[in-house]
From Swiss-Prot:
InterPro entries: ATP_synth_b, ATP_synth_B-like_membr_sf, ATP_synth_b/b'su_bac/chlpt, ATP_synthase_B_chain. It comes from the Bacteria. Belongs to the ATPase B chain family. This is ATP synthase subunit b'. F(1)F(0) ATP synthase produces ATP from ADP in the presence of a proton or sodium gradient. F-type ATPases consist of two structural domains, F(1) containing the extramembraneous catalytic core and F(0) containing the membrane proton channel, linked together by a central stalk and a peripheral stalk. During catalysis, ATP synthesis in the catalytic domain of F(1) is coupled via a rotary mechanism of the central stalk subunits to proton translocation. Component of the F(0) channel, it forms part of the peripheral stalk, linking F(1) to F(0). The b'-subunit is a diverged and duplicated form of b found in plants and photosynthetic bacteria. It comes from Prochlorococcus marinus (strain MIT 9312). One of its GO terms (molecular function) is proton-transporting ATP synthase activity, rotational mechanism. It is found in: Cellular thylakoid membrane. The gene is atpF2.
Length: 153
């Protein structure tokens, strides 16, 4: 007891070692058990559920992100393929258009040349007919002149 008095503690103080100490220890253990079973475990369960929910959402988000990246890559490939196909189709259409234009131009030139040749042949025919007619008229006129000259003599 001298030791307790030396530190200024008196009997009936805060840390008296007597029969109430084991009772207090039992109360602390009982309170810890009650708090653990009524408060800490349910809160822990809620926290664990929330952690599982968050981790599942993160995993799901990562999976969806990887799926989106795959789809994006696939769509970019399809887009590039579509662009290439469109360029090929446009090129083919331009070639076909040029071919049709050249064919139409050649046909028009052939028709123009045929019309020109027909007109030339017609002109030659008419020229030949006119020459023949002039020749015949010249022959008739010369015969007429000869006949008049013969009659006058």
């Amino acid at each position: 007891m001298l030791a307790f008095n030396f530190f200024g503690a008196t009997e009936g103080g805060l840390f008296d070692i007597n029969a109430t100490l084991p009772l207090m220890a039992i109360q602390v253990v009982a309170l810890t058990y009650i708090l653990n079973s009524l408060f800490f475990k349910p809160v822990g369960n809620v926290v664990e559920k929330r952690e599982k929910f968050v981790s599942n959402n993160i995993i799901e988000a990562k999976n969806k992100l990887s799926e989106v990246k795959k789809l994006e890559a696939e769509l970019l490939t399809q887009l590039q393929s579509a662009r290439t196909e469109a360029q090929r189709i446009v090129g083919e259409a331009e070639n076909e258009s040029d071919k049709l234009y050249k064919e139409a131009l050649e046909l028009a030139n052939n028709e123009a040349n045929a019309s020109k040749e027909k007109a030339r042949l017609e002109i030659e025919s008419q020229t030949s007919a006119a020459r023949d007619q002039l020749s015949k008229q010249a022959d008739d006129l010369s015969e007429l002149i000869v006949n008049r000259l013969i009659l006058e003599k």
